[in-house]
């Protein structure tokens, strides 16, 4: 499996899933929760004619929010799943909120649509800092995926009983569709580094995978333009990147999404068929579920293979060591007849009176 696979869900992918959920499952009744893995929770919601399962993972290697098929019943006895299951019993999910390019998702629950909000589930999808929070109507933390002590963070302490506060404010620029090419170029040219990091360090919502997508869809002279220092990139190539940059912003803002794959193991939710010559007849949420299901299983297999290889290597070394010990003992024992004769002679010598 190549580096960067499975692809980390960026804000564009998150936004595409939330757009689907907002359109298709609100309002809906909470039904149950289970925790199949330490860093993953699965939630079930029931509508008038359908049942929807969601999976949220705060695993640092692959944080994600997905609509999934009905899973096996695993992890119903975990403390977190019990707290959520009992706390949200008979409640309805009435809103899903996520602001602009922020990676914080808020699920709001009430006894019925129109009532005051009684509980919240907050999902923070921020790489190794990802987390889940279960809050009351005063934003007091009832349960949390992973606790953060004051010694671990200078910004906020995360523990049950404390009041929830969001992550630090993102001070980078917000991408704007009406920004001019010159303004965009001036903004990313302040520090002369690779185009990839110029974009990541300047604008909100830019991930390494987005820079790769812009590179793939842009007709530039250099096929690896994102790794090139911005001072050495021609104006024509920058304008080509900027053209697709504005397309991305437009589709992000207008929730215009479609799933496609590129470079074998990577995906995009804002490319269209005419841009990459790709036909996909499966809907976006199903495609995302299939992608992560396949690649996460492959990753587990690879980790298991490496574990088995380590065990075999260790056992082989032990066997070689034991073989050497036995061989040494055998070599020494080849003269045992001589030693036996000498000792016999000594034992049979007549003793002096």
Please place each PLM-identified region on the residue numbering:
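Extended, highly charged segments
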Residues: 1-347
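A short, hydrophobic C-terminal helix/tail in secreted or cell-surface proteins
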Residues: 348-353
């Amino acid at each position: 499996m190549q580096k960067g696979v499975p692809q980390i869900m960026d804000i564009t992918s998150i936004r595409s899933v939330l757009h689907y959920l907002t359109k298709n499952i609100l309002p809906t009744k909470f039904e149950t929760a289970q925790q199949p893995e330490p860093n993953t929770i699965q939630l079930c919601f029931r509508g008038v004619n359908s049942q929807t399962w969601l999976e949220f993972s705060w695993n640092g290697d692959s944080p994600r929010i997905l609509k999934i098929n009905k899973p096996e019943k695993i992890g119903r006895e975990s403390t977190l799943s019990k707290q959520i299951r009992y706390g949200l019993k008979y409640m309805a999910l009435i809103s899903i909120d996520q602001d602009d390019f922020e990676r914080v998702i808020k699920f709001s629950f009430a006894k019925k649509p129109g009532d005051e909000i009684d509980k919240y589930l907050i999902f923070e999808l921020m790489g190794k800092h990802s987390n889940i929070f279960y809050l009351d109507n005063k934003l007091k933390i009832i349960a949390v995926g992973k606790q953060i002590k004051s010694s671990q963070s200078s910004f906020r302490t995360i523990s049950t009983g404390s009041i929830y506060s969001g992550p630090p404010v993102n001070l980078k620029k917000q991408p704007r569709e009406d920004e001019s090419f010159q303004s965009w170029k001036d903004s990313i040219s302040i520090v002369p580094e690779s185009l990839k990091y110029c974009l990541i360090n300047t604008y909100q919502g830019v991930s390494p995978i987005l820079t790769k997508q812009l590179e793939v869809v842009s007709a530039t002279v250099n096929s690896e333009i994102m790794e090139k220092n911005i001072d050495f990139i021609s104006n024509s190539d920058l304008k080509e990147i900027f053209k697709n940059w504005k397309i991305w912003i437009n589709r992000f803002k207008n929730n215009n999404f479609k799933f496609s794959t590129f470079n074998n193991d990577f995906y995009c939710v804002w490319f269209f068929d005419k841009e990459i010559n790709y036909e996909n007849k499966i809907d976006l949420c199903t495609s995302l579920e299939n992608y992560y299901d396949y690649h996460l299983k492959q990753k587990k297999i690879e980790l298991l293979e490496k574990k088995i290889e380590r065990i075999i290597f260790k056992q082989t070394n032990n066997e070689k060591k034991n073989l050497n010990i036995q061989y040494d003992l055998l070599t020494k024992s080849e003269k045992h007849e001589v030693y036996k004769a000498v000792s016999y002679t000594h034992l049979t010598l007549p003793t002096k009176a």
